[in-house]
């Protein structure tokens, strides 16, 4: 960045996407400040790295800023945004700042409706194992790093490309991965055709020497292939995919498969994350790594040491023979994949699911898809919608969803609004051998942590 930019202020710095960029900028030597409504492990980490954190949004927070960075969740009437405009301080979306970081490196951007965080994490892990030492900006905590960002000394930057508001079009990656294209963020897009058009534009932004890595198993990705004008490779379980997986085996938290490239057997891959959907994510990472000439043996070693990602089928703990697992899945496609992975890996265990819908708009637009997403749950409890800043929509409630799921044939479905009553209900329902899975992008993970404490206390009493 131009030398006169010294102090960078983030509105909503505690968000997982914002904090990663802030951490890299701190490590680059910039003065970073930011505001958020409350403290967290993320804000504490940024403070320990030298960031200045304000709690609450106030005009004076931007007084010394040279640029203000906002996420799509921050509105124009935010007092810090208003003040920045009054002071003629540039206000830019987070994707524009990420694009500026990517401009300094060769960018590897992972896009897609689902699987971005896991795939980005796999790519980052394997590139690190291969000695490339990439800069990393991930939308989740990489367990092996203990954080979601790292400044590397190598030439590459690995990051997620967020399609939710179209701002990923600001990025100009050298390698672009598209894991899938699905209907989501319909408060921004008019429908699936506009989403597909936007992904095509993203793919075609790579340079002539770049590479697109595309999932052939996804119907919407396959649909847009004739419109891709740049060099690409495909991956999937399909026999037509360039990178293909066979002999997939799922057992507990472990997944293994045999990888092939254009009909040639490469070897076996094993990693500690369940689910056939993660086989696809792994294939994407293999394709990226082999484009960068990382030996397959090194790729195997990288996967063997892959520790997973926070809030992606993450084992929180175990007590009284009950495993407590948390997952970020909040879209019907993600929910079906996660529950399917749980059933495939733990066929003998009863699956007790607590789901917190995320956003009124998403719940409304995908209501019927949600209704059909929970068939692999033995016990399903829904709690109130996490608004994520949205105003309620009349008739769109977790209770209405629970009733519709029940009418669709799901036998054991309960809606509980109050958290204490929810935990009391779980204490009555859970039995040794069960898996308690909290699902959602909001704060439903707190239910799992509370239940772990209660289960351990019950064991000691």
Swiss-Prot record:
Pathway: Cell wall biogenesis; peptidoglycan biosynthesis. ATP binds at residues 112-118. Pfam families: Mur_ligase (PF01225), Mur_ligase_C (PF02875), Mur_ligase_M (PF08245). It catalyses: UDP-N-acetyl-alpha-D-muramate + L-alanine + ATP = UDP-N-acetyl-alpha-D-muramoyl-L-alanine + ADP + phosphate + H(+). InterPro entries: Mur-like_cat_sf, Mur_ligase_C, Mur_ligase_C_dom_sf, Mur_ligase_cen, Mur_ligase_N, MurCDEF_pg_biosynth, UDP-N-AcMur_Ala_ligase_MurC. It is an enzyme of class 6 (ligase). One of its GO terms (cellular component) is cytoplasm. It comes from the Bacteria. Keywords: ATP-binding, Cell cycle, Cell division, Cell shape, Cell wall biogenesis/degradation, Cytoplasm, Ligase, Nucleotide-binding, Peptidoglycan synthesis. GO terms for molecular function: ATP binding; UDP-N-acetylmuramate-L-alanine ligase activity. One of its GO terms (biological process) is cell wall organization. Its EC number is 6.3.2.8. It is found in: Cytoplasm. SUPFAM superfamilies: MurCD N-terminal domain, MurD-like peptide ligases, catalytic domain, MurD-like peptide ligases, peptide-binding domain. Cell wall formation. Belongs to the MurCDEF family. This is UDP-N-acetylmuramate--L-alanine ligase. It comes from Geobacter sp. (strain M21). The gene is murC.
């Amino acid at each position: 960045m131009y030398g006169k930019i010294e102090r960078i202020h983030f509105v909503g710095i505690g968000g997982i996407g914002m904090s990663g960029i802030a951490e890299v900028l701190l490590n680059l030597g910039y003065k970073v400040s930011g505001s958020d409504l409350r403290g967290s492990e993320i804000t504490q980490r940024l403070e320990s790295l030298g960031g200045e954190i304000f709690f609450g949004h106030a005009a004076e927070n931007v007084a010394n800023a040279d640029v203000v960075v906002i996420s799509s969740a921050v509105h124009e009437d935010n007092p810090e945004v208003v003040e920045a405009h009054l002071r003629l301080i540039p206000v830019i979306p987070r994707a524009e700042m990420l694009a500026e970081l990517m401009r300094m490196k060769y960018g590897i951007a992972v896009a897609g409706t689902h699987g971005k965080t896991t795939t980005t994490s796999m790519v980052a892990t394997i590139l690190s194992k291969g000695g490339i030492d990439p800069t990393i900006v991930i939308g989740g905590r990489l367990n092996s790093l203990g954080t979601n960002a790292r400044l590397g000394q190598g030439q590459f930057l690995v990051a997620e490309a967020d399609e939710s508001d179209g701002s990923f079009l600001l990025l100009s990656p050298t390698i672009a991965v598209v894991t899938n294209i699905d209907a989501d963020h319909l408060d921004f897009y008019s429908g699936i055709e506009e989403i597909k058009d936007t992904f095509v534009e993203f793919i075609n932004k790579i340079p002539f020497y770049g590479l697109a890595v595309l999932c052939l198993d996804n119907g919407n990705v396959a649909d847009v292939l004739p419109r891709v004008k740049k060099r690409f490779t495909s991956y999937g379980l399909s026999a037509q995919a360039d990178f293909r997986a066979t002999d997939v085996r799922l057992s507990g938290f472990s997944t293994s498969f045999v990888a092939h490239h254009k009909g040639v057997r490469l070897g076996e891959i094993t990693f500690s994350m369940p689910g056939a959907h993660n086989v696809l994510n792994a294939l994407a990472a293999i394709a990226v790594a082999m484009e960068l000439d990382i030996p397959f043996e090194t790729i195997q070693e990288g996967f063997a040491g892959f520790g997973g990602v926070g809030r992606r089928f993450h084992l929180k703990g175990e007590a009284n023979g009950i495993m407590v697992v948390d997952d970020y899945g909040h879209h019907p496609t993600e929910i079906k994949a996660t529950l399917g992975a749980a059933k495939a890996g733990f066929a003998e265990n009863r699956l007790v699911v607590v789901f917190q819908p995320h956003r009124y708009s998403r719940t409304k637009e995908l209501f019927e898809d949600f209704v059909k997403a929970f068939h692999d749950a033995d016990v399903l409890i829904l709690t109130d919608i996490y608004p994520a800043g949205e105003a309620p929509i009349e008739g769109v409630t977790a209770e209405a969803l629970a009733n519709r799921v029940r009418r669709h044939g799901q036998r054991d479905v309960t809606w509980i609004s109050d958290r204490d009553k929810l935990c009391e209900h779980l204490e009555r329902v859970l039995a040794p051998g069960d898996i308690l899975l909290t699902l959602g992008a909001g704060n439903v993970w707190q239910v799992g942590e509370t239940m772990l404490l209660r289960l351990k206390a019950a064991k000691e009493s």
